Amino acid sequence: MSFVLILPLIFFLFSCGVRKSIHYLPDINQYSLDIPKINIINDSTFSYAQNYLTKNKQQLWELYIQGNPLQLGYNNGALTQNLMRRQEEIFFSKVESFVPSKFKQKILGKFLKWYNRKMYLNVRDEYQVELYGLSQYSSEKYDFIAPRYLRNLYLHGAHDIGHALQDLAIVGCTSLAVWDANSEDGDLLIGRNFDFYVNDEFAKNKLVEFVEPNEGIPYISVSWPGMIGVVSGMNKEGVTVTINAGKSKIPLAAKTPVSLVTREILQYATNIDEAIAIAKKSKVFVSESILIGSAHDRNAVIIEISPNNFGLYHAKNSSKIFSTNHFQSEAYKNDKINQKHILESHSEYRYKKLGELLEEYKELSPEKMAAILRDQSGLNHRRIGYGNEKAINQLQAHHSIIFSPEKKLVWVSSSPYQLGEYVCYDLNIIFSEKRLQNGEFATSSMNIAQDPFIDSQEFKDYKECKEKMREVEKATSTKDQFLSDQYLNHFKALNADFWKVYFETGKYYYSKKEYQKSKIEFEKALTKEITTTQDKNTIKKHLNKTLKKVKLKK
């Protein structure tokens, strides 16, 4: 990296409030604290006073914590220390694979400190105190990125930064709410897939958190160890939040992570109006849709929030509302970024698919909602390949979740993706003295069975295809690594309806100067349901390059 590029970063580091931000620590003196002494019951069950961590038979980790902000952080960190450190290792090893140079890692660390310089000014004091407590149990291994407290703060903006800076396709969530005529018993029912994908290891240790703060409303949240923000959750009052990434400009500074806005909503809102008021006062740095459900209102709305705009989308004369990854409110009607995103991404396709599935299943029960969230077909039941991001089930969800706010019931998917058993939790029981009377947090009699697809040959083929995809990509970029036609034909047959197997095979043949074979593969890819306009244009560019090579050979 040239000195010309380094110089601005050095300037940033010692300007714009960076020095102040990197030395900042929250004031913890107002809070009492008992340092947790963990009781190890077995290799997957731990306790401290009335705080617990255990792994259920579906392999979901369940955490119950209570206390003031500082105590919550310490209790969380002490109980989940090994899981949290493992999660941090998985996340930052991904960063290290992108930036292997130690020198460039230092530059990245400086950039992050500059980029996140205003974050601490936009996060509630109590959450900073909680993060401070949690960070006492973080590893020192990644101090080159930032000190432990700041690093934990930065990680809470990872979802936001990921889709803002890289516009990652790995953030493409789907959620819906139905009530009255569209639900089986007329009650509000909400479902969502959280398609935030780092890698399979990152999704391995799912954490179902039950949090009982000294101030505010107890709530359930589903995410990963080390996370105090909320991406999917419901409070004891029956207010639900789920977040879906929108299309964003690249912001100049990180402010309030959306997951901490939704945490505040769960902790302090009892209805939709209170949730809207919290969202309105928040200074976010990316665009996000927040689907809010409310037992008190027996309704759901979508808050569409961005750095310079705020919109509300209500279902007019309807008892259903859908949210994918584009905005629908009047406030964004003329937003060019949003319009372009609707045309070029897979968001509108999934939106239409939700409408198609609701017509098919009609009055939804939790079981029917699970079937919708697991659906892998395209519009009109077209086979579009397993793992296609145009599907509701993209086979990459970190988790899937179903809420029944009026009954205070929550169903959380177990691995893999949303295919495993949905485990039922009754908040009426969990946030009462009855919570562990039967020896578990779950109300297992109400679980939703795993998807039969788990045991199918198609799923085995899909997993093999993913492994072989990596081999094909590696061979494409390695000059002296060759694959046989037999190998490549088998690779394509494993997921024959998916455009990407033909595209990757075409790139492989092109790299080995087999242009006629490459041409055939790119043409085949273009006959399939391609995920985005950008993907289609990329294939066309590769095909045009190949056609020129074919002509030259003649």
Segments from the language model and where they lie:
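Bacterial Sec-dependent N-terminal signal peptides
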Residues: 1-22
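A generic structural signal for short, solvent-exposed coil/turn residues
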Residues: 8, 182, 214, 233, ...
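An acidic- and aromatic-residue-enriched active-site/binding cleft used to recognize and process polar
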Residues: 17, 181, 193-195, 246, ...
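Internal mixed beta-strand/loop scaffold within catalytic domains of large alpha/beta enzymes
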Residues: 151-261, 277, 398, 402, ...
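Short, surface-exposed beta-strand-loop junctions and turns on beta-sheet-rich folds
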Residues: 196-198, 248-249, 308-310, 416-420
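Extended amphipathic alpha-helical segments with heptad-repeat/coiled-coil character used for oligomerization
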Residues: 301-322
